[in-house]
Structures are given as structure tokens and as C-alpha cells.
Amino acid sequence: MADLSLELCGVKLKNPIIAASGTFGFGREYDELYDIGQLGGISVKGLSLKPRTGNPPSRIAETPSGMLNSVGLQNPGVDSFVENDLPWLLEKNVAVIANITGTSVDEYVQMAERLAPTGVHMLEMNISCPNVHEGGVAFGVKPESVYQITKAVKAAARQPLIVKLTPNVSDITENALAAQEAGADAISMINTLTGIAVDVRRRKMILANNTGGLSGPAVRPVALRMVWQSAQKVHIPIIGMGGIETGEDAAAFMLCGAQAVMVGTANFTDPFACPRIIRELNDYCDAQKVQNVQELVGTLKAY
């Protein structure tokens, strides 16, 4: 058996497999199927200051090798999470990552302040949200805005801050560097790629919001490339994600430079995906005679 444990931003994880935000709720449904305490961590459903009802249906569309979602960050609000879900989660002996969203820098700062005195282990800041003060342009598109929001939230946060980067940019490494320079403790990538689904018979969009976020195996080659490129530029930890379905997929991200990975869409197609991937990653390490999984990180060779 390989040693899968690691320390991420000062937080000890049993293994590098983390359930991705938006695909795992607050963990309760999955805990009915298996002990979620065996995971490395859980990034909970995206939280906002106030409850959000999300977008109208339809909100999900299946695509070849993936799915489009336009859920709209439906959630009960941060206060409800802290009062009703966090105490239960903290009993599960798993690293809890609070994924935070907002419509302004001030909202993100308030989220960090609200979560500061809680037992949450890390914050993951979703900066793919539109900035209402900048004409609706997402925070994560421009390096300048990535730097600004990261610096402000880092000043308010007590927990390590992970900045989740959008792939919908020309050069993701610029935003990775901006996050690092502003004080981010780690970056996670990639968030979903923007796409649409078309009903050709009705000649209509399938999603009520028109556009949605593409995830699943279809995005994996793009995600691997972006992790690999960013690992050449930054020295803070990278958490890789994008279409991970197997232990070898997880290993590929680590070879590209990720210290840990997040599993998202696979949780929908196989509710037991996370524990299975942990086993498969261990099997891969044993076959490769790797004693500690962190030996894989950044060892990808050029052709």
C-alpha cells in the first residue's frame, strides 16, 4: 500500500481525493452510501451570504462525454450552513472546504469574515461569478481583478485560501500568477467551460439560462494542459480537476503538477466514484512502485 496522505496548505489530508463543490452537496446523501470520512476532503456546495434559489429549469443538459449545468449556485446561505450542516460535517473527520461566491468584493470579504471563527479547514473562492460593479464581467477573467479580490479576501480570511480559476480566458497562467502574488495559499483549476446545448427540432436553447458550464471527461485534456502550464509558473499548490473518473486520471493531474485533485461530475454517474478512485490511485502507485503519492507531482516528461 502506498502512502496517499499529504499536507495541503498546512491541513493534513488522508489522500489527495477531494469531492468537488456543486457535485456533493454537504455530503449527507453520499454518507448514506459510504463513510465520507475516507475522503481527503469535501468542497461543499457554493455558499453565498443570503439563500439563493438558482436559475429556472431546465438547468442541466447531457452532452457527449460530459454535461452542461446552469444551476445558478442554489444554496441555503452561509448562516444555514454554519448552523445546520457544518457541525455534522466536522464530526466526519474529513477536511471541510467552504466554497464561497459573491457579486462584489465586499460580499466575498463578508463571507470570509463569517467563516473565520468556524471550524472550516479551508476556503475555496469561486471567482467565475459576475461582478455587478464591473458590468457583469466575471471576477476571474482579468489578472487585475483576480489580484484585487484575492488580496481583499486573504486579508479577511483566517483559513488557507484556495482561488478557483476559470478556464474561459486566453492565458490561465496570468491569473494563476495574479492569485499567487495576492497571497493565495493554493489555486484550484479548472472551473467549467462555457457552452450551450441546442434542441434542433424546436430550434431552441435547451438551458433556460442559455449558457451553462461544461464538465466531465470532455474537458479533461484542456484541464490537464492548464494545470501543466500553471505548474511551470507558480510555486503554490495546485488542486487539479476536470473530468476525473479513474485513479489513473487523478495520477495524470498529479504528474502535470497538481498536489491534490477534485472529483466532480463522476459523482453523478457513479455515486461511489471518490472511494473507488482512492483505491485505483493506490493500485496505480503500487504498480508503479511509488511509495508516497506526492512522488508523482510534477514528474511528467516531455515526449
Predicted segments, located by residue:
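Short, surface-exposed connector motifs at secondary-structure boundaries
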Residues: V11-K14, E91-V96, A156-L161, Q232-I236, ...
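Alpha/beta catalytic cores of nucleotide-metabolism and tRNA/nucleoside-modifying enzymes
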Residues: L214-H235, I239, E245-Y303
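Flexible loop residues that form catalytic
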Residues: G22, L47, S128-P130, T192, ...
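Structural signal for hydrophobic packing residues in well-ordered secondary-structure cores
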Residues: N93, G119, K154-A157, L281-K289
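Hydrophobic faces of well-ordered beta-strands that scaffold small-molecule active sites
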Residues: L4, I17-A20, G40-V44, V96-I100, ...
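Short, charged, surface-exposed secondary-structure boundary motifs
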Residues: P51-N55, A197-D199, P271-C274
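Alpha/beta enzyme core
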Residues: E32, P57, T103-I239, G247-A252, ...
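N-terminal capping/small domains of soluble enzymes
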Residues: M1-V96, T101-G102
